[in-house]
Amino acid sequence: MAQENPKMHNSVISKRLGAEWKLLSEAEKRPFSDEAKRLRAMHMKEYPDYKYRP
């Protein structure tokens, strides 16, 4: 979406993507959730003492 509309503000892109995400079924969302879990586990393994500090 950002590549198709390079002048579009990031907040507008985020709102549109959020709206599209809400329209997806749980089955369509599952691959993304599974990948997030895999990456989270990999990060925990590589950086066991990591603490989020904003």
Swiss-Prot record:
User: What's the domain of life for this entry?
Assistant: Eukaryota
Family matches, as Pfam families: HMG_box
Q: Name one GO molecular function term.
A: RNA polymerase II cis-regulatory region sequence-specific DNA binding
What GO cellular component entries does it have? nucleus
Q: Localized where?
A: Nucleus
Q: Which residues bind DNA?
A: 1-51
**From its record, what is one biological process in GO terms?**
neuron differentiation
Q: Which UniProt keywords apply?
A: DNA-binding, Nucleus
Return the protein name.
Answer: SRY-related protein AMA1
Lineage of the organism: Eukaryota, Metazoa, Chordata, Craniata, Vertebrata
